């Protein structure tokens, strides 16, 4: 509807250009917005104020000229010029009512558009290190990233969903070594477990699999393992130095092939679990992109070489540094250590270079808020490589903090005492988790109230919205039980009987849905959909409590049923964009 109004105004402006009222080269971006006060119409535009200066006319005179040249349409019943030159547009009754037929005809497609048609967008999200199960912190990034991808797809973008698998580097070595040390315990070798190793039960489980399938094949004695190692933190040493020494010892004693086998076992078990976990959460990907593949195909060295050739690298203290300060970063960054090993940042440069070369119009990274300092260096690298860094949009997601019984739930990944995403789903359900995660702006901290998420009350937003959908389904079951039938054509022909204020509010809210989707998609804010659904559910529940639907008069009955069926469809469409189901019974 908004697009149709903009088209009418653009036609009027074109006519004024042709007759000389407006200069022929006048360019203007016609914006039509919904009014907050219905006394000022349904929509308004300030286009006359924008055109007044280039036309050298008073804004009200321009507004009057535009109104006079508006094409005849059943869409606009009347216009009104307000203030310095605002044009208020009052919709015709049939235009307001036509949304019901549109919703019925379009069904699941209602609200979708082709705004982004022809443009490719990549959304990379979650990308948690495969060093353990996903925890509740990862859950918010998963729900948010999936919803952003679905919103962009809903407005016509060609969306590619990607998970970057950090299957190389120190954290993976810590995991592999942790698995081996737990395995040694199962073979009877007594060793102090490193302070900085991974301690979760899942490490025991992987170690048990290794022992069950391979017996003592990877067993080494404590004396040769501990010989010459520096002290760990409890003994006055440095925990980072100790775990690095233990990793080196594991590689030395096991040899490349055996160490790689243990490493791969840990990686694959956890990665399979992450895939299953996300699939159960309703989150799927087009590509699982391996960090290690970048090194294997020489992409990391190529990125470094391109930076070197462009004169953006220098050597200091035996390491290779990127002059990222030349491109707005707060300090220069190491891309290759003094031991010849490339850094995680170097892999990230190669990965983002690869993304740009794949031809996406936009690249969206969804990162945890703790990575905020990482954004300038990645953009600096892209700029140094001659890429358009504005194509990269990094969305930072704040942590979700769980509360149970009013008390904050503590979590820590390496110690193993964390709440997993799977445990959260088991406690509150997938739907509540998906909805609660996206009902605030991503940059806002989220206090996740577990008790509220499980409650069956109007205070629980996802329950309140789903209950509205289920209530409509219940009305339809009652209709069938009474032997009644709904005639959609008859109902839509009698919508003019819906004169109650509740009915008018619902009609207006339903008509806004496509605009809400476009607005939410363009600024990557799924919470706008959540807020809209809460508003629509509230409108419906108020209506439900005030009126009967299965009345004796067929015309009113069919009209009201057509209205609430439209509500049901829009709620289902909106919940679907957030990865939430629309149950028929509750």
From Swiss-Prot:
Catalysed transformations (reactions): tRNA(Arg) + L-arginine + ATP = L-arginyl-tRNA(Arg) + AMP + diphosphate
Keyword ATP-binding (UniProt): yes
GO molecular function, one term: ATP binding
Motif ('HIGH' region): 128-138
Pfam families registered for this protein in UniProt: Arg_tRNA_synt_N, DALR_1, tRNA-synt_1d
EC number: 6.1.1.19
Keywords, ordered alphabetically: Aminoacyl-tRNA synthetase, ATP-binding, Cytoplasm, Ligase, Nucleotide-binding, Protein biosynthesis
Keyword Protein biosynthesis carried by entry: yes
Gene Ontology cellular-component annotations: cytoplasm
BP terms from Gene Ontology: arginyl-tRNA aminoacylation
SMART domains noted in UniProt: Arg_tRNA_synt_N, DALR_1
UniProt-listed HAMAP family: Arg_tRNA_synth (MF_00123)
NCBIfam families the record matches: argS
Subunit annotation: Monomer.
Family affiliation: Belongs to the class-I aminoacyl-tRNA synthetase family.
Official protein name in the record: Arginine--tRNA ligase
């Amino acid at each position: 509807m908004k697009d149709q109004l903009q088209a009418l105004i653009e036609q009027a402006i074109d006519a004024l250009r042709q007759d000389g009222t407006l200069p022929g080269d006048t360019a203007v971006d016609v914006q039509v917005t919904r009014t907050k006060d219905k006394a000022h119409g349904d929509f308004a535009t300030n286009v006359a104020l924008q055109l007044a200066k280039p036309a050298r006319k008073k804004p009200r005179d321009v507004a009057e000229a535009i109104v006079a040249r508006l094409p005849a349409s059943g869409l606009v019943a009347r216009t009104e010029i307000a203030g310095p030159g605002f044009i208020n547009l009052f919709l015709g009754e049939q235009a307001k009512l036509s949304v019901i037929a549109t919703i019925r005809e379009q069904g699941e497609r209602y609200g979708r558009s082709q705004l982004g048609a022809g443009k490719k967008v990549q959304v990379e999200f979650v990308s948690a290190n495969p060093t353990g199960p996903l925890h509740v912190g990862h859950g918010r990034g998963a729900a948010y990233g999936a919803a952003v991808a679905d919103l962009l797809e809903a407005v016509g973008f060609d969306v590619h969903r990607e998970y970057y698998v950090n299957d190389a580097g120190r954290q993976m070595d810590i995991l592999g070594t942790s698995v081996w040390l737990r395995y040694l315990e199962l073979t009877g070798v007594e060793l102090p477990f490193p302070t900085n190793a991974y301690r979760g039960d899942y490490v025991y489980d992987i170690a048990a699999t290794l022992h069950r399938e391979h017996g003592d094949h990877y067993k080494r004695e404590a004396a040769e393992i501990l010989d010459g190692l520096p002290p760990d933190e409890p003994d006055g040493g440095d925990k980072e130095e100790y775990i690095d020494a233990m990793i080196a010892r594991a590689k030395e004693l096991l040899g490349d092939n055996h160490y790689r086998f243990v490493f791969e076992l840990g990686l694959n078990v956890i990665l399979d679990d992450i895939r299953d976990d996300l699939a159960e959460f309703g989150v799927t990907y087009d590509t699982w992109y391996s960090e290690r593949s970048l090194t294997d195909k020489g992409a990391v060295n190529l990125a470094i070489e391109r930076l070197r050739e462009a004169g953006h690298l220098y050597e200091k203290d035996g390491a290779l540094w990127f002059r990222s300060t030349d491109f707005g970063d707060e300090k220069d960054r190491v891309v290759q250590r003094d031991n010849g090993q490339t850094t995680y940042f170097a892999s990230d440069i190669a990965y983002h270079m690869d993304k740009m070369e794949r031809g996406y119009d936009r690249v969206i990274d969804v990162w945890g808020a703790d990575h905020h300092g990482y954004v300038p260096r990645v953009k600096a690298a892209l700029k140094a490589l001659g890429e358009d860094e504005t194509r990269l949009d990094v969305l930072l997601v704040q942590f979700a903090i769980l509360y149970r019984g009013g008390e904050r739930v503590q979590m820590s990944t390496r110690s193993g005492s964390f709440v997993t995403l799977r445990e959260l789903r088991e406690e509150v359900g997938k739907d509540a988790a998906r909805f609660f995660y996206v009902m605030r702006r991503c940059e806002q901290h989220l206090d996740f109230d577990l008790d509220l998420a499980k409650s069956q009350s109007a205070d629980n937003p996802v329950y309140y919205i789903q209950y509205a959908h289920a209530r409509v389904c219940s009305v339809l079951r009652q209709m069938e039980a009474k032997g009644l039938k709904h005639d959609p054509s008859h109902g839509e022909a009698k919508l003019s009987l819906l004169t109650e204020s509740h009915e008018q509010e619902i009609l207006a809210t339903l008509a806004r849905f496509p605009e809400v989707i476009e607005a939410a998609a363009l600024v990557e804010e799924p919470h706008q959909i959540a807020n809209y659904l809460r508003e629509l559910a509230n409108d419906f529940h108020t209506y439900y409590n005030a009126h009967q639907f299965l009345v004796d008069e067929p015309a009113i009955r069919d009209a009201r049923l057509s209205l609430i069926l439209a509500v049901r469809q829009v709620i289902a469409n909106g919940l679907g964009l957030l990865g939430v189901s629309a149950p028929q019974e509750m």
